[in-house]
Amino acid sequence: MARVGVLLLNLGGPERIKDVGPFLYNLFSDPEIIRLPVRAFQKPLAWLISLLRSSKSQEAYRSIGGGSPLRRITEQQARELQSYLRNIGIDATTYVAMRYWHPFTESAVADMKADGVSEVVVLPLYPHFSISTSGSSFRELKRLKDGDDEFAELSIRCIRSWFDHPAYVSSMAELIKKQILACDLPQESHVFFTAHGVPKSYVEEAGDPYQDQIQNCSLLIIDQLENSLGFTNSFSLAYQSRVGPEEWLKPYTEEVLEKLGKSGVKELVVVPISFVSEHIETLQEIDIEYKEIAQKNGIVNFKRVPALDVYPLFIEGLADLVSSCLNGEGISLEEASKLPERVKLYPQEKWQWGWNNSSEVWNGRVAMIVFLSFLMELIIGGGPLHQIGLL
């Protein structure tokens, strides 16, 4: 009988203040996070961004206790899912693979091989597919498979997205309903979906399905919510967490909050739709930054729907996804990691600067130019990095 491993994919997060810089470097080293036409620029740019953003990010993590709870919650989700699966007769072991911090994907793969797993179900903890989230994790897993004959022998099936799964939609609707009914005037409360943004070019140029899935998911949740409540709430959708000068999906969360407040909305129920675990973007960005913006613009009652974490119906839904995959649904890792033809990315592989003496020289020159430009801006107090908000 096949020994089943369920591999949960997630982003990862720094657990201590001193981890913030290395975490940011790992994040921005990923070509799916920042798409550059020249491979040699990726590492210097990641180093520069992590250097510039570390101080501000460290303050954000201090405001929520000094580190991200994402690993703890994800591992708790893994335990709950494993217990549920075994209770329904599926003898599976769950493993956690973080993309940018511990436990890394390599560690999870090593654990599965050591445990004698022969069949793997890959389940991203991102309901909505994007080339920068699930796509990046699938590609990293494919890279490991291509370089490991033992891992390549395993049967691997993947779940690409699950934004429309009934248990997920119902879980979200139930949690939103609780917050609406806790408002002073439930029927007048405004439901505000906020999703993690991606650059607009990902959708319009690269064919990323993320925006369509977010919009469709919001409508599914609203429809179920209305059926449950018996009345209709106004609602809107926006995108948060943009980085850098590039245009991201609009409207932006902070701008919509200002408009809602000025339009007379007093009771707001904020729904972090693309997050299934509490982490920096719910606990700090929404609960602190966006709450302050809302209150400054006249919103009196600001309620935030909690992340799903280990909500029982949500765990049941994850188990159903695993069960369906074991029964023939799901797709191959090759298909899951495949990008639209319009996406131009260099291979996602571990690499050292330089492949020969000439390239070493050019890599050094690029790094020196970046470093000197950074120092010059610090000295004169102005320049492109100041203009785009990195300094």
From Swiss-Prot:
UniProtKB keywords: Cytoplasm, Heme biosynthesis, Iron, Lyase, Metal-binding, Porphyrin biosynthesis
First-level EC class: lyase
Localization (cell): Cytoplasm
CDD domains in the cross-refs: Ferrochelatase_C, Ferrochelatase_N
Gene Ontology molecular functions: ferrochelatase activity; metal ion binding
Similarity annotation: Belongs to the ferrochelatase family.
The protein's role, per its UniProt record: Catalyzes the ferrous insertion into protoporphyrin IX.
Reactions that this protein is recorded to catalyse: heme b + 2 H(+) = protoporphyrin IX + Fe(2+)
InterPro entries for the chain: Ferrochelatase, Ferrochelatase_AS, Ferrochelatase_C, Ferrochelatase_N
Residues engaged in binding Fe cation: 196, 281
Domain of life: Bacteria
Name of this protein: Ferrochelatase
Record PANTHER family: FERROCHELATASE, FERROCHELATASE, MITOCHONDRIAL
Keyword Lyase (UniProt): yes
Listed GO biological process terms: heme biosynthetic process
Gene Ontology cellular component annotations, sorted alphabetically: cytoplasm
Matches recorded under HAMAP family: Ferrochelatase (MF_00323)
Pathway per the UniProt entry: Porphyrin-containing compound metabolism; protoheme biosynthesis; protoheme from protoporphyrin-IX: step 1/1
